[in-house]
Amino acid sequence: MVTIEALPLRPIEGEQQALHVGAHSSASDPRRTMVTNTSESPLASRQATLTTSTRQKHTSYRLNTAFFLFGLLNNSLYVVILTAALELLPQGVPTGLVSFANIFPALIAKAIWPYFLRGQVRYSKRVWSCAALSFIGMLLVSFFPALAMRLVGISLASFSSGLGELTFLQLSTRYAPKSSETRSGLTAAQAAGAGLETSFAGDAVGWFASGTGAAGLIGAAAWWVVRPLGVQTGMAILSVLPAFMIMAYAIILPSVQELLEGKDGKGGAMYAPLSTEDDAVERSSSDDQPTTANDDRQDSTIHIGPGSEQDVKVRLSFQEKMALLKPMLQPYIIPLVIVYAMEYTINQGIAPTLIYPLPTRSSHPLLSHIIRKLTDYYPLYQLVYQTFVFLSRSSISIFKLPAIPRHLLWLPAVLQTGLLAVLLTESLYAWFRESIASPLVIVLICVEGLAGGSAYVSVFYSIGVDEQGRGIALPSTGEEVDDEGQEEDSAYTMAKKAQEHEFRIGCVGFGDSLGILAASLISMPLQVSLCDAQVRSGRDLCKQT
């Protein structure tokens, strides 16, 4: 005898579900009802499990690839502009002007946008808008040699980069946790406290951070490849990069529902996501029930029940956003500001003054092949820094290392402050032993890159898998909700927690930009002061670069 058991899933935004128990349930959509056949052969069961596992891995790879490309493409133009700063400005104009135009608009986007947004994020429009702004900005830089127009173009690209980072971090919160899997074998509660819990949201953040780290290397390399063609042609070629970001969003990125369909029966029954309005409109081909643009384009509107015509609209008030912001300051935002303020002060204000006599083959065989003139020191420092930023930002995604636990997120800030103090005093007093001074500085810059990258990925990973964000995928009770009022309350709570999670990860994003902006204002006078102090003490190598 065949026993058929139907387990209902929670209704998902943008879909109309009809679940029936009995003979009719065996013909229902398998994406919305789990059917267990007790007479199924072991071989068929193993084959089904293998197929499901393969499908889930493929979908998970798509998610990881998409978010890696988002981080890479969104941040590459920022790096390209910084690398090409000297070629973009007339002679005699300080490169700090490019740095300011390249960071201040991004800070504005990250700091203000989450508070002006009302209701649910429209991700498709955001991605298209970011790509368009970047494209226009790069064309202005390419075809208008006037300083004012180039600064406008740089500012547009910067604003796009800041808004893009905010958008993709918020998008990551729309992906549900993975059952109870952990990297360490701990219970879910223990893993959450230690920052070890795995989730699709955590994977998305990890791979996005890895992409932003890779942008430092690939963006600089891209400019050096097109540089011989000149600013106009080179920048015009690189202006097509945002188009690949749209392709990654439209083609590679899976919907939330696709991830859950790829899981085994247990995983699919435990979690039901709140999808974005884009899932319903742009990926409607994968749904059995047709959706209309008007239904799904309503900002912050969710459907609350099978066959229900009622909608719930959710909008966070400014007071609610302020209440969500306050608990994020001490554990996340302030440490991130300090890390990046110290890090970029080292890179822009102190590192250019850490110049030493050229290494000889007898004393430093390897360095003597890399550093052939005094101007080679600073590019080497930047290459080492970017490499170790990439490695540390990839610690979760590629190297499968745990994130820094929430209660230890201040450690990178303390470490960066200590590194700044050490390198500042070395620049002033040259207290490192001469034979090891330059290799030791390189090692310390490696540590600086590791600390900064690990702080970035750990902060956003911690928020992505935070218990407070679980409203995005709530456990199913396995029972039909008969009372319409209770069902509406549940749907409203789900949608509100989803928006709260989006805001929480979005409001932290301005921390790194604020630190970088502060560092850019400090670094210009600091570099001049340090070099003058070295000259007064009889060391004039900084004047020769």
From Swiss-Prot:
List the subcellular locations.
Answer: Vacuole membrane
Please name the InterPro entries in this protein's record: Battenin_disease_Cln3, MFS_trans_sf
Region (Disordered), start-end ranges: 23-49, 276-304
| Biased composition range(s): Polar residues | 34-49
Query: Pfam families given for it?
Result: CLN3
An example GO biological process term is:
amino acid transport
Q: Which domain of life does the protein's organism represent?
A: Eukaryota
Cite a GO CC annotation. Answer: vacuole
Q: Report keywords, A-Z.
A: Amino-acid transport, Membrane, Transmembrane, Transmembrane helix, Transport, Vacuole
Please indicate if the UniProt record lists Membrane as a keyword: yes
- UniProt membrane topology term: Multi-pass membrane protein
* Stretches that traverse the bilayer: 66-86, 97-117, 127-147, 205-225, 234-254, 322-342, 408-428, 440-460
The function of this protein is: Involved in vacuolar transport and vacuole pH homeostasis. Also required for cytokinesis.
PANTHER family given for it?
BATTENIN
Q: Which family does it belong to?
A: Belongs to the battenin family.
Protein name from the UniProt record:
Protein BTN1
Name of the gene = BTN1
